[in-house]
Amino acid sequence: FGVAKGSGMIQPNMATTLCYIFTDADISNDILKKLLKKNIATTFNAISCDSDTSTNDMVSIFSTGKAKHSKINSFHDEKIQEFDVALKKVLLNLAKRVVADGEGASKFITIKVQNCRNEIDAKKIAFSVANSPLVKTALAGEDPNWGRVVMAIGKAGVQLNFDKLCIDFGEINIVQNGKINVHYNENETTDYMKNDYIDIKINISNGSKSFTAYTMDLTKKYIEINTDYRS
């Protein structure tokens, strides 16, 4: 199990986030550290509330050793794979909760970038979209402004062929091979934008690597919280 706090100044590298994971499994510190580092990449380092990385943050994992089994000292131990899956599940759940609790958040946004040449490119695109003020305000206003998503993809600095670009909001395909889908129904997409959970899928179509980022919208409440705040 674990606990985490943080709602503002969050784009961990690992930022203003405190997270503590506890397990009764008797696992050596070296293995715990490696498992934590491996799973942070796609959990806490895949979230962004406001794109700002704080001067401090921490995710720690502790073993109480209370479980009655022989100590795990090797990655080849058959118990490690099951523990690895469970650890990622806990970390991802906590990371998503930090985003959902973000300052002024009204929507939870999942941005999945698929079929890139490499994971670095996929991550750049995902965070370029996740951190775009124009994208985030459009989402807050429940506006299916896919043009802003295209803009954010373009400014990511990744070489790509826009003639192969595909963009979906939820199950609705908006852009197909670089052009608006001839069957696109804006009213249907506008209705989808009223949901509290929004999925944006971006298919780059020039490779096989992917990255998923999690973020929130940028609301008037967020601005009020941060303009009224005094240090």
Locate predicted features.
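A structural signal for small-residue-enriched, beta-sheet-centric alpha/beta enzyme cores
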Residues: F1-S231
